[in-house]
A protein has these predicted regions:
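Glycan-processing catalytic domains of CAZymes
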Residues: 1-216
Length: 216
C-alpha cells in the first residue's frame, strides 16, 4: 500500500452488532463478543510503521438499520469515542481522525443531530482531529430503492440541509459512487463538490470497485 502512494487507512467501523474489533470495556458489558485479536491496536501499529494515518470508524449497533432512526447510535458511541481515545488515540500518533460510520442517503430521521453530536465529541476529545462521513446516493442501483431513485434536485436540496447542520463538526464527505449509473456521475458529483465548497467541507469520493450484479 505504501509503495503505491496510499497514505491513509480508514476502518469502516469498529464493530457491528455483537462483533467488535477491539476489547471495548463498554461494549463487552453490553454483550458483545471478545475479539480474538485487537485489530485496532494492530492497524494503528502498522499504520505508524509505514507512515500512514488511520481513521477510526465508530461502532454500529444495528439499531439504526432496524428502526430507521440514527439517534440510537449516539448513546453507544459516546462511550466508545471516549474509551478509544483514552486507550489508543493518546498512545498512537498514527491515529489521524474519525469516520462517523452511520450511512445515510437522504434526509434520514435523526441524521443531522446524530452526526453533529458525534462529530462534536470526536473533535473535543482529540483536540480537533478531522471527521468525515460517507453516505450513499439513493440512485437506481441502490438495493432498496431501484424503482424510486432520487433526482438530482432532490439530492441537492436534502444534502444542502444536512451540510448546513453538520459542517462545523464534520470536515469531509466521501459520497459512495456505486449506487448511480455511470452517466450520472458527473451530474451528482458536481452537486456534491458545489455543496461541499459552499460549507467549507472537503469533497472526497468513496470509489466502490466491486460488482453489483450478484445477489447479496
Amino acid at each position: 500500500m505504501k509503495s503505491i502512494g496510499i497514505d491513509t487507512v480508514i476502518g469502516i467501523r469498529s464493530g457491528y452488532r455483537k462483533f467488535i474489533t477491539y476489547p471495548s470495556p463498554y461494549l463487552l458489558k453490553k454483550g458483545c463478543y471478545m475479539p480474538s485479536v485487537d485489530l485496532l491496536d494492530l492497524f494503528l501499529r502498522l499504520a505508524g510503521k509505514y507512515g500512514m494515518k488511520f481513521y477510526f470508524g465508530l461502532y454500529d449497533s444495528g439499531e439504526y438499520w432496524d428502526t430507521g432512526d440514527m439517534s440510537h447510535e449516539v448513546e453507544h458511541n459516546k462511550y466508545v469515542i471516549d474509551e478509544v481515545w483514552n486507550m489508543y488515540g493518546r498512545k498512537y500518533e498514527s491515529f489521524g481522525g474519525w469516520y462517523l460510520s452511520g450511512e445515510i442517503s437522504r434526509a434520514t430521521k435523526g441524521a443531522i443531530g446524530t452526526f453533529h453530536a458525534l462529530g462534536k465529541q470526536c473533535k473535543e476529545v482529540s483536540g480537533g482531529l478531522p471527521t468525515f462521513i460517507s453516505p450513499w446516493i439513493d440512485g437506481k442501483k441502490a438495493v432498496s430503492n431501484a424503482q424510486n431513485a432520487v433526482t438530482a434536485d432532490e439530492h441537492e436540496r436534502e444534502w444542502d440541509e444536512i451540510f448546513d447542520g453538520i459542517h462545523d463538526v464534520v470536515d469531509a464527505c466521501a459520497f459512495q459512487d456505486g449506487h448511480i449509473d455511470y452517466d450520472e456521475l458527473d451530474l451528482f458529483f458536481s452537486i456534491n463538490k458545489r455543496l461541499a465548497d459552499k460549507y467549507g467541507m472537503k469533497c472526497w469520493t468513496n470509489a466502490e470497485s466491486f460488482d453489483r450484479d450478484m445477489p447479496i
